Swiss-Prot record:
UniProt main location, coarse: membrane
Biased composition (Basic and acidic residues): 8-22
Residue spans crossing the bilayer: 115-135
Region (Disordered): 1-34
Coiled-coil regions listed: none
Membrane topology summary: Single-pass membrane protein
Domain of life: Eukaryota
Gene Ontology cellular-component terms listed: membrane
Keywords: Membrane, Transmembrane, Transmembrane helix
Name assigned to this protein: Putative uncharacterized protein RPP38-DT
Amino acid sequence: MESLQTPQHRENQDKREKEYGVKHMPMGNNAGNLEPEKRKAVRVALSSATAAQNIPSSVHCGCSKQWRLRLPSESLQSRGQVMKRPNNILKLRNLDLLIYPWPELRRRQVASDLMSLLLLPAFSGLTWAPFLFLFTYLPPFLNLLTVGFVSYFLV
């Protein structure tokens, strides 16, 4: 990757390093330029889909959505000002992904939808009782009111 950079790009990068004191961050694409142990750390972080579960503390994911190596010489500078952060903020949290089978997810979604309907602030459980009563017993009663049944009483 380094060899593909234009001289103008390299000059801009050197100027930025002098100005802000930030060294070029080795990304996954050009990690081959690093020492063997740092290269191994990058390879471990990039090699598997479960890398988020066991990432070395020197590897982190920035805004570019790409894993990169945090060099010990890297200073915490942003726009020339040193930012003090606790170490635990810089470390990545372990991801505990809860993976449910599809029927279980659907069941949970339906249950939460029903609960959200019943727990509206303007409607209590008792408010729904008359509607449930009507919808349960009214259709069979309306089936009785057919033309033949009604005409029997009218004639």
